[in-house]
């Protein structure tokens, strides 16, 4: 199968945990079923560069990180069980700000 191409975006400080890169275009193995749960594991192993505890908590995103898939709240799409589709855009927004 062809690669699964998706776009990851990080904003409002989430990019600081990923090498200060706000947008990444990924080509994932198309022979594998990619859910958000699988994607988070891949991100943790491959691109999460700073303080993973600020992004992942017990195999999901920690409270305070909003996740939008194609501009739709992931809670409406099944959260971790959502199966990624070709050209999906996954946006992570941090609401955790220091004072």
Swiss-Prot record:
Covalent link (Glycyl lysine isopeptide (Gly-Lys) (interchain with K-? in acceptor proteins)) residue numbers: 99
Subcellular location: Cytoplasm
Disulfide bonds: none
Associated pathway: tRNA modification; 5-methoxycarbonylmethyl-2-thiouridine-tRNA biosynthesis
Entry similarity comment: Belongs to the URM1 family.
Self-association state and partner proteins as the record states: Interacts with cer.
Official protein name in the record: Ubiquitin-related modifier 1 homolog
Annotated source species: Drosophila virilis
